[in-house]
Swiss-Prot record:
It is found in: Cytoplasm. Its cofactor is Mn(2+); Mg(2+). It comes from Koribacter versatilis (strain Ellin345). Residues 46-234 form the RNase H type-2 domain. A divalent metal cation binds at residues 52-53, 144. This is Ribonuclease HII.
Length: 254
């Protein structure tokens, strides 16, 4: 049976949006609330942690995860998926989250481990390390679309960072931390334009990989990295693919 082809999502100009841009539009329409936290509390949970990771799709640098237990008696306004927030707002919220939450923890898995395990299991590992790093252990986990091998009640939520305040808080402090790491490395590896692309796939990044080869902090198991020395026609195909899947510029802004 042949499945009907999905209709493309169109932008304001009537042209089809890339997959990444279409997802970003969807996320903007979702409402971030404490609905899932309240459901967990109603089931008897006292310490509810939100967990998320950032950098999963990047070509360069670690994958970073965070776990946050928000104080249910202190509301932090403006929490939403970190991809939807300007960098300055993320910085302000990250500080506020760390100051007013019950507990928070950040963990990173480096490129060597990513290449050894694959990015799915490396992300999973980073999340587990983040949970274990909390100063008090939670009795319920809210996780962005993943389950962890931990002895704790869990609720995986698709688009959780756009729907759950706790997961959104985790996504914010994880992104602020990872972006700070990238800022430190950008002057060391200026040829890859890391200040602009944050280590993600982008046409200038792909071209730099072809011209200079990968750095020690690139993920050698990722196709755009190990294919950097591919023939020109393959590179052109990769650039076309990148144009559709690259993270929209507003997500990467400083």
């Amino acid at each position: 049976m042949v499945r009907p082809k999905k209709k493309p999502v169109l932008g304001k100009d009537g042209k089809p949006l890339s997959a990444a841009a279409a997802k970003l539009r969807l996320l903007k329409r979702l409402k971030c609330t404490t609905k899932y936290e309240k459901l967990a509390a109603d089931s008897g949970a006292k310490l509810i942690a939100g967990i998320d990771e950032v950098g999963r799709g990047a070509l360069f640098g670690p994958v970073v995860a965070a776990a946050v237990i928000l104080d249910p008696n202190y509301r932090i306004k403006g929490l939403r998926d970190s991809k939807l927030l300007p960098a300055e707002t993320r910085e302000i919220l990250s500080k506020r989250i760390r100051e007013h939450c019950i507990a928070w923890s950040i963990a990173a898995v480096d490129v060597a481990r990513i290449d050894q395990l694959n990015i799915y299991w490396a992300s999973n590992l980073a999340m587990k390390h983040a949970v274990r790093g909390l100063s008090c252990q939670p009795d319920h986990l809210l996780i962005d679309a993943m389950k962890l091998d931990l002895d704790c009640a869990q609720t995986p939520i698709i688009h959780g960072d756009a729907l759950s305040a706790s997961i959104a808080a985790a996504s914010i402090i994880a992104k602020v931390h990872r972006d700070a790491l990238i800022r430190e490395w950008a002057p060391i590896f200026p040829e890859y334009d890391l200040a602009s692309n944050k280590g993600y796939s982008a046409p200038k990044h792909i071209k730099a990989l072809r011209e200079f080869g990968p750095s020690p902090l690139h993920r050698q198991s990722f196709a755009p990295v190990w294919m950097a020395s591919a023939p020109q026609e393959v590179l052109e195909f990769m650039l076309e693919e990148t144009a559709d899947t690259a993270v929209p510029p507003e997500v990467l802004e400083d």
